[in-house]
Amino acid sequence: MAFRKKALAIVMSMAMVATSLSIPTTTAKTAEAAGTTFNNLNQSQITEAMGVGYNLGNSLEAASSGTPNETAYGNPKLTEDLVLAAKDAGFKSIRIPVSYLSMIDDNNGYKIDSSWLDRVQQVVDYCVDNDMYAIVNMHGDGYTTVTGGWLLCGSSDQTKIKAKYKACWEQIADRFKNYDEHLIFESMNEEFDGTYGTPSRTAYANINAYNQIFVDTVRKTGGNNDQRWLLIPGWNTNIDYTAENYGFALPTDDYLSSKIASGEKRIMISV
């Protein structure tokens, strides 16, 4: 129930913000299907199309000792039957939290393990192949409480963090660049410096920088990514610390496709 409430809150937030912003066996099949038509939906249309969402939590973001492990938190492996059950219950969107952690090779250009990306893609295909929206993010990598967490806005080594973050999103975005509008990328989840209370301006500036890197990097990978809806959070995905004067900055979208009508936006905010 908590996951459903969280997902519903995200979709409702998308509606408010968008309005205010004037396995290898399935890979080939989906890539071909995804590359056929991209429907450019404006903020009202995408909100209606996504409807109520369901969060597939404690699965692909689960980890043990710094290594992603889909069953580490006690859930069985995700199946297409689960996605279909959610669809039958009236959900139109599925959020898929994903942790990468040790699946990223720091000694090889921050390359993400291909078998892990295959599994992420397989779960995405469960959704889009059944005409549902899928939201894919970077999840536990930004937690100070998760072993191996590295996307840490309070860290002093921001140069390395930003390079790693950019490299990761280049790979994720490239993997999915031919998917249609049913796929949405979310930059990160509940990112903050681990200290509850008033946000640190310095750490918040790093979060803003991550969001800008995310938008620019995804757009530049080409395919359909230059017109795809993107989802970004503020401090700890907190509505007050995002909407009020605590330091949040909406990223610019300089590489948005010319196919998008002038004045229209393609960035959502998660709160």
Task: Give, region by region, the residue ranges found by the protein language model.
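Bacterial Sec-dependent N-terminal signal peptides
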Residues: 1-11
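Hydrophobic core
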Residues: 12, 16-20
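Sec-dependent signal peptide cleavage junction
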Residues: 20-35
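N-terminal carbohydrate-binding accessory modules
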Residues: 31-93
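Hydrophobic faces of well-ordered beta-strands that scaffold small-molecule active sites
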Residues: 52-56, 94-96, 134-136, 185, ...
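Solvent-exposed loop/turn segments at secondary-structure junctions
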Residues: 58-62, 93, 99-104, 140-144, ...
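An active-site-proximal structural segment forming one wall of the substrate-binding cleft
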Residues: 74-93, 109-140, 144-184, 206-219
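Extracellular glycoside hydrolase catalytic/binding regions
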Residues: 75, 167-170, 174, 179-182, ...
